[in-house]
């Protein structure tokens, strides 16, 4: 329990450091790199990130940072990042509708041990199912496919992220 709690606090601290300047936003890609960086071997094959620059408000960055932290932790303990040759691929896009912009992303694990449906719902699953919808109106779906966990998530982007400049040092 202590280790999990410490990891969650570290994740929050990392995200807050990214947001130290209130007039700037942090990119979704940087939040991903912040959480997944320890597993990136530099080959561009173990961790694959693909998508446009998407600035996030502090609320979105903190909430998504926690979700990505939980996905990363589970991948490292039980999934594709727990074995040599395992891979995490995150693809994202922004769609522009009549009244809002929506960020959609897919987290896809492959090359890990066979996946089975968990016996109980862990913190990460509860975060995706209940916390993110309440905090940032996100909708997510988790598929425990035998060849790797897949997560699809969609969330509205606030209008203010359109005009906020991202930190130049990220």
What are the residue ranges of the model-derived segments?
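Conserved transmitter core of two-component histidine kinases
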Residues: 44-52, 105-108, 142-143
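Conserved short strand/loop->alpha-helix "switch" segment adjacent to the catalytic nucleotide/phosphoryl-transfer site
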Residues: 41-87, 119
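Glycine-rich nucleotide-binding loop
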Residues: 113, 145-152
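C-terminal end segment of the histidine kinase catalytic
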Residues: 153-170
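Hydrophobic core positions in the C-terminal catalytic ATP-binding module
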Residues: 88, 140, 149-155
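Short beta-to-alpha transition helix within the HATPase_c
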Residues: 3-41, 91-93
């Amino acid at each position: 329990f202590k280790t999990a709690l410490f990891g969650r606090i570290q994740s929050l601290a990392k995200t807050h450091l990214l947001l130290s300047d209130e007039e700037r936003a942090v990119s979704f890609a940087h939040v991903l790199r912040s959480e997944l960086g320890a597993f990136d071997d530099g080959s561009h094959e173990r961790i694959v990130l693909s998508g446009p620059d998407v600035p996030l408000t502090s609320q979105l960055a903190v909430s998504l940072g926690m979700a990505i932290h939980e996905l990363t932790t589970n991948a490292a303990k039980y999934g594709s990042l727990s074995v040599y040759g395992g891979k995490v691929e995150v693809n994202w896009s922004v769609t522009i509708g009549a009244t809002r912009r929506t960020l959609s992303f897919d987290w896809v694990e492959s090359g890990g041990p066979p996946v089975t449906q968990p016996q109980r719902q862990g913190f990460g699953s509860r975060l995706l199912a209940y916390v993110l919808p309440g905090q940032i109106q996100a909708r997510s779906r988790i598929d425990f496919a035998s060849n790797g966990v897949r997560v699809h998530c969609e969330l509205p982007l606030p209008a203010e992220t359109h005009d906020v400049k991202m930190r130049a040092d990220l």
